[in-house]
Amino acid sequence: MASDLLFLPGEACFAAALPMLIKTTFPDYSVATYAWIGPALGALARWAGGWIADKLGGARVTILSFIGMAASIIGVITFLPSGGDGGNFPGFLACFLAAFVASGIGNGSTFRQIPVIFRNQHLKGLTEGTPEYARALKQTETESGAVTGFTAGIAAYGFFFIPALFANFAVTSAMWGFVGFYVTCIAITWWFYARKGAESPS
């Protein structure tokens, strides 16, 4: 699932990036004062993401979360110091917090998407109450549970991914890489899960 990849440059990634960027690009501001806000907002947004996905559909909400993250990171880039400009910390922080919220919403919608995708794949054309339906339902639960666990596990790599990325690339270049990644995920999610006639609508 493309939406599984949300968790690589997503909430955990942002949780690693925000304190690093405050420390290196806005050293006059305290990391301890601001770094906790983003993860807290992201955690609250997860519930909202699941609820909204129930109303609008998981794929649609996941795409909107990718759009929100891309727009937020472009805002972060805009407010970073560049050249002789010292940057704008309030704008930087607001955009970064918006990225956390968008990622949290995508987190919630992705976990709503996963079982729907497997149900659509395995139960299509089967009659409820038949042995075939029962076997397919059990297979659906097994596979969706495994993918859910795998998806959650990906998040842990964010804490390794960010320091390695910033050690090898300029901050602005890395951020533009995030934007490109989100655009790619939008296209993949739309093609496989959201468009009319999609392979696995969710």
Predicted regions and their residues:
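Intracellular juxtamembrane helix-capping segments at the cytosolic ends
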Residues: 105-135
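Extracytoplasmic gate region of multi-pass secondary transporters
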Residues: 1-43, 107, 111-112
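Residue-level signature of mid-helix packing/kink "hotspots" within the transmembrane helices
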Residues: 39-47, 156, 160
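Helix-to-loop junctions at the C-terminal end of transmembrane segments
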Residues: 45-58
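A membrane-interface helix-boundary motif in multi-pass transporters
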Residues: 164-182
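Multi-pass alpha-helical transporter architecture, strongest
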Residues: 177-202
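A late C-terminal transmembrane helix in Major Facilitator Superfamily
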Residues: 125-170
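C-terminal transmembrane helical hairpin of 12-TM major facilitator-type secondary transporters
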Residues: 59-110
